[in-house]
Amino acid sequence: MATYAIVKTGGKQYKVAVGDLVKVEKIDSEPGSSVQLPVALVVDGATVTTDADKLAKVAVTGEIVEHTKGPKIRIHKFKNKTGYHKRQGHRQRLTVLKVTGIK
């Protein structure tokens, strides 16, 4: 079984392993810089670690590959019988991370 971890960033949790490319909420750092992510769970073969004291010693490091945007989301609000229409669009800013190590 492979080693993987559950990391928390941007209010979400992601399952990552070494070498994975993960799209996460935007992180304010330059591409090429290294970041450390907080760990919620580590699985190493048959061993599952959830103890907060042991997880404090575990570090998941990653390298920022690029900043990008997610797909276009279209919002349309409509009120009946009043002529109210509101169209709005949104593209979430994302960061592509390459996981370099789980130690």
UniProtKB/Swiss-Prot annotation:
InterPro entries: bL21-like, bL21-like_sf, Ribosomal_bL21, Ribosomal_bL21_CS. GO terms for biological process: translation. The keyword Lipoprotein does not apply. GO terms for cellular component: cytoplasm; ribonucleoprotein complex; ribosome. Part of the 50S ribosomal subunit. Contacts protein L20. This protein binds to 23S rRNA in the presence of protein L20. Coiled coil: none annotated. Belongs to the bacterial ribosomal protein bL21 family. GO terms for molecular function: rRNA binding; structural constituent of ribosome. PROSITE patterns: RIBOSOMAL_L21. This is Large ribosomal subunit protein bL21. The keyword rRNA-binding applies. It comes from Mycobacteroides abscessus (strain ATCC 19977 / DSM 44196 / CCUG 20993 / CIP 104536 / JCM 13569 / NCTC 13031 / TMC 1543 / L948) (Mycobacterium abscessus). The gene is rplU. Keywords: Ribonucleoprotein, Ribosomal protein, RNA-binding, rRNA-binding. SUPFAM superfamilies: L21p-like.
